[in-house]
Amino acid sequence: MKTRFWSSDWIAGLTITIVVVVLTLGGSFDGLERAFYDWGVRSTDRKPSDKIAIIAIDDESIANFESWPWPRDLHAALIDKLTEGGVKVIGQTVLFVDPQRQAGMDHIRDLIDFFSTASFDDVPADIDALGAMLEFEGNSPAVKEILEFYLQSSINTRMSRDIETLKSRLFEAEQALNSDAILAESIKRSKNVVLAAVFIEGIPRGNPDAELPDYMLQNSLSEIRDRVAAQNKGLFPFSTVGALPPIPELGIHAAAVGHLNSKPDFDGSVRWEPLVLQYYDRFYPSISLQIAAKSLNLDVNEIKVNLAESVELGSLTIKTDSFLQMNTFYYSDNAGAPAFQVDSYFDVITGKIPLEKYKDKIVLIGSTATGVGTPQVTPINTAMEPVLTLAHSVSSILNEDFFTAPEWGLWAQMGAFLMAMLYLMLLMPRLKAGVAFVVTLVLVLALVATHYVMMTNYTMWVQLMTPGALLAIGYLLITTKRFLVTERGKARSDEESAESNRMLGIAFQSQGQLDMAFEKFRKCSPVDEQVLEAMYNLALDFERKRQFNKVTSVYQYMAKHNKGFRDIESRMNRAQKMEETVMLGGSGGHAGA
C-alpha cells in the first residue's frame, strides 16, 4: 500500500512542481524567460521617433582625422555646425571627465608665467620713461645726440611693440592649444548640449568624501514622490558611492548632465535602463531622460519621480519597475533599413551632409569605431553600439514605447503554476498517453501564445514560460515513470509466464509428450539456467527414443542462448552423426530388400 502511494502519479506531479518552483526561486529558469522576452521584443513592431539622428565617430572618421582620442576642438567644431543647423538637442556620449592636455600646452603656460614675472613686462614702461627723461634734458648736446639715437633705434621703434606681440602670441598659442576652453565656448554658445557622467555603483556606508560640483547638484532631481510606501519597503533606485562628472569648465555650460550607466542582466544583455540613480541622498537622471526632457523644453526640476512606479515628463508617463528601470523598447529594422539612420562624423564636418537635415532634431553623438567603445548585447543585436542603445531609449521615452511587468503578473504566474500542478496531479493520470501528449502540448502552446500576445499587443511581460516548462517537464517525467512501471510489470509478467511454461513443459515431458514439452520450453523467456536444465533433460529423453533430429534441434536452440552450457556442443555433434548414421542405415536396408 505504501509503495503504491509513493509511486502514484499525483505524488509525482506534486514532487515535480515543488522541485520546479524551488529551481525557479533560485533563478534556474531565468534564461528561459529572458529568451522568450527577447523573442517578444523582436516580434513587436513599433515606429521609432523620427526626431532622433545619430552622428557616429566611425572608422572612416578616425582614419581621416586623428587617432583617438581626438582634440576637443574637433568636438567643438561639430557642435558649432549643429548649432548653426538649428538642432533641438545635442546628446554627447563621449566622456569629458579629465582635462585634455595638448602637446606643448604646459610649455606655453610656463613661458607665460615666466613672461609675466620677468623684466620683459616692465620694458615698455621703462622705454617710455627713458624717452621722457631724454626729451626733458634735451638742451645738452650730448643728451641731444643720445635722444636722436634713441628715437631712431629699435629700442623706441620696435622693442615695446615686439614685446607686446610676443605676449599676445603666447596667449593666442595657449588659447589655441586649450581645446577644453574651445569646447566650453561651443557648448556655451549652443545652450542645448547634454553631457554624460558616470556613477560608481555601491552601497554608501557614511557620507561622501566630497560634495559633487554645483553644476551636478543643479542636475539632481527634486520632485520625488512616494505613493506606494516604497521607502518602507526599501524600493529605491540603485545606489552609488562615486561619480565621474564632466570637468567643471564644460559642466557649467552644459544644458544638462545625465548618467550613462547601464545595468546588464545576468547574461550580460541590456534589456532595461536605470532612469534614475541614487547618490547618497540625491537622485540623478539618466542621459536619455535628460535628452528627452530637453527636447520637450523641460528642466530637470520638472521631471517627476514616483518611487517604485514611474517617471513623468510633462504629459508622458514612463512606467518602470520597483527600482525605476525602464524596459527599453528596441526597434527592429524595417525592410532592411535601420531603425535610426547613422551618419559619419567626417561627412558632417566636411559638409557632405547638409546641416538642414538636423534642424529641430535630437542629435546623438557617439562612437561606433572598432576598439573605441564596448558594444552591448541587446534583444535585437548581439553587438549594438552604446549610442544606438541610447537612441532606442530616448525613442522609447518620447513614444512611451516600453515594456512593463504588470502588478498582477506575479499572480498570473502563480495561477499558471497552480493550473500546471493540478493538471499533472489530477487530470494527466486519467488520460491515455496520446491524449495526454495532445492536451499538454495545447496547454504549453496556450501559455506561449498568451506571452506572445501580451508582449506584441500590450507591451506587457508576464513570465509564463516557467509554468510551461513545468508542464513539459512534468509530462516527460510522468510518462517516463509510467513506461518504467509498465516495463517492470511486463518483466514480472514475463517471468511468471516463463515459469508457467517451464512447469507445463516438465509436465508434458513426464507424460512422454516430448514435442509439446519442447514447444513450452521455447516459450520461456528469459532462457535461464532452469530452462536450459529442463531442455537438456528433454534432449536426453529424445536421445533415448533415438529421435536424433529432435535432439539436434533442442541443442541448437540451447546453443543460441548459452553455447557453453554443459557438454551440449559435443552432444550436438554426436547427435548429428547419429542422425546421419540412422539415415544411412535406413537407406541401406531399403536397398537390400
Each PLM stretch: what is its role?
Residues K2-L316, Y358-M428:
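Non-transmembrane functional regions of envelope-associated proteins
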